[in-house]
Amino acid sequence: MASISINCFFTPQALARPSRTRKIFAKPDKVSGRTRSPRKTKLQREVELKSRGGDKLQPVSDAGGEATTYTRLPPREDYYDVSLLSSSYLKVSEEVKLSESNVARVEEKIETLREIEEEEKEKEVKSYDDDDIWGNYRRLDVFEGSSRSIDEDDEDWEDEVFEYGDETDAEKDDSEGSELKDGEVLCFSGEEEEDEIGVKEKGVPAVMRCFDRAKIYVRAGDGGNGVVAFRREKFVPFGGPSGGDGGRGGNVYVEVDGSMNSLLPFRKSVHFRAGRGEHGRGKMQSGAKGDNVVVKVAPGTVVRQAREVGSEVEGEEGEEKEVLLELLHPGQRALLLPGGRGGRGNASFKSGMNKVPRIAENGEEGPEMWLDLELKLVADVGIVGAPNAGKSTLLSVISAAQPTIANYPFTTLLPNLGVVSFDYDSTMVVADLPGLLEGAHRGFGLGHEFLRHTERCSALVHVVDGSAPQPELEFEAVRLELELFSPEIAEKPYVVAYNKMDLPDAYEKWPMFQETLRARGIEPFCMSAVQREGTHEVISSVYELLKKYRAANAEPKALFDQANENLDHVAKKIDKERRAAINEFEVFRDSGTRAWHVVGAGLQRFVQMTNWRYMDSDKRFQHVLDACGVNKSLKNMGVKEGDTVIVGEMELIWHDSANGSSRPTDSNKTSTDSVRWPQWK
């Protein structure tokens, strides 16, 4: 098959839209003594496509007029060569002999076409690099390179092949792979890659997570900026300032939602930001308040402030983080972060001495923090025990809960809650916790993730598997894990329920188990949760313990009333810190440098709210530094000409004037060349 080689030079414009080159193919008159058919059959095109792609044809029997065809495709040569297969394998493969010679003739015809194609490729002009061309673009040969079969009648078909740049890594890999000898198999081992990357530590699968811990980011809204405006009205020549104040930023609230039983919503929603207050306007119009944001949590959520990255307390395992809020009952609502105050407009700065103030404040930035949320289920009774002891079955019998029940350990992966009703006004919430193993207090198994849920339970039910080899040891192991995790949990009242009495093994071991526990002063109960036998006695006994516990510990209600009164104590504390007096500050010097730091919550807030676009703001700032005693403290500590004074986010340069007065000036300000104001450095 003939082709035309075209040499072309690429320019940047040509690369953007290369010209299309038509290829002209010469039609051979005869191939192997036969006239070529006007159109190729589908079989011919597929075989020709395979031959052009570089794949070897499958072996054909040498017998004249007969071809060997497999009922299934032979193995790919990318993995191993067919020639390596033994003759026994070929005999086992099912074969079909074709008496007609059509297939053999097609194969013969294709071999002839391949020979002609190889001869034509040898005559083609190879591409070469032309280093003398500006732009260092490559001189290329456009030649036949299509792997698609071409019909005679397909005259409008065009093929274009372009190369640009050096050979890619993928092409190099392909060329290296093509140099393998016949019969060679290239194997890749994942051990080297595993050694380089290392074994990553996997966490608990998503299906096994309770989502009782979460870390979220909350930020109150910033206050709106004040505006500098003046009254412009007909027949009012001196209207005076009319700039309004900015609106207050939105608050961040935490509210208990009774419909939630986990912290799953915080898996994807992590950031909670309140709206910013609107800026002030003319005509004494104040900006609107920003939108509040409400973070809804499940009952029993404990809110702690997360440790900041790089803090000194980070990494200390023994120290508990401070508890900000403990929300137990649905409907509780606490103000966590108050919004920033809006900046004042120029109307707020007018006075008898300054009737035309050209000054306004920025809005106060809203506070922000990272919070650690921990959920402790609020349940009256907790069901504990070893895996596959029948805890979920007991919960499904005594309540309307439908936990997953199966005859294998760790069927329960998440805590389940159920409500048990005795009378119209007598109910109790029962929690089914996953099974505990030896070492659960150290994090072994699933127990460490859920043991803390028992801290809020008033009573416990120990379910013992009667079919276990030694039920007494199983009971003692669970008790030991509870004591090691928290001695307070071990001191809570509990009831022992000996389960699976419907099994012969459990029935035989019951007398010995009962005698062992009675010797320790414990009266156990026997039951069969599957048969619903003995469960009423167990729950009735637990309910009696619960009533006694509530009567003896009547202070939780008082604590609840006190908590309702102090739910906003976090916001009050933050607001008090932000309202610190401006004269409360500390000055210290960096060792080895000429930098002085003035640290104070009031001063930092003042610097942040100062709008430095107005010259009156600079004058006011210098006056505040003199009034609160910053300049005096710096001179007493030995500040010198040219030293850097850092107040909040501002860096100033200290200068001593000729008349003996000293003051820091802003190092970031440009020169104003004003007669009234000194030149800013």
From Swiss-Prot:
One of the GO biological process terms: rRNA processing
PROSITE patterns: G_OBG, GTP1_OBG, OBG, OCT
InterPro entries according to UniProt: G_OBG, GTP-bd, GTP-bd_Obg/CgtA, GTP-bd_prot_GTP1/OBG_C_sf, GTP1-OBG_CS, GTP1_OBG_dom, GTP1_OBG_dom_sf, OBG_GTPase
Molecular functions (GO terms): GTP binding; GTPase activity; magnesium ion binding; mRNA binding
Basic and acidic residues bias locations: 43-55
Subcellular location: Plastid, Chloroplast stroma; Plastid, Chloroplast inner membrane
Region of interest (Disordered), residue spans: 25-72, 657-681
Residue span, OCT domain: 577-656
Every Obg domain range: 208-378
Keywords: Chloroplast, GTP-binding, Magnesium, Membrane, Metal-binding, Nucleotide-binding, Plastid, Plastid inner membrane, Ribosome biogenesis, Transit peptide
Effect of a null allele: Embryonic lethality when homozygous. Embryo maturation arrested at the late globular stage.
Cofactor(s) in the UniProt record: Mg(2+)
Residues reported in the UniProt entry to bind GTP: 385-392, 410-414, 432-435, 499-502, 528-530
Residue intervals of the OBG-type G domain: 379-547
Tissue specificity field: Specifically expressed in leaves.
Known role: GTP-binding protein involved in membrane biogenesis and protein synthesis in chloroplast. Functions in the biogenesis of thylakoid membrane and plastid ribosome during chloroplast development. May be involved in the vesicular traffic between the chloroplast inner envelope membrane and thylakoids. Possesses GTPase activity in vitro.
PANTHER family named in the record: DEVELOPMENTALLY REGULATED GTP-BINDING PROTEIN-RELATED (PTHR11702), GTP-BINDING PROTEIN OBGC, CHLOROPLASTIC (PTHR11702:SF44)
Identification of the protein by name: GTP-binding protein OBGC, chloroplastic
Gene it is expressed from: OBGL
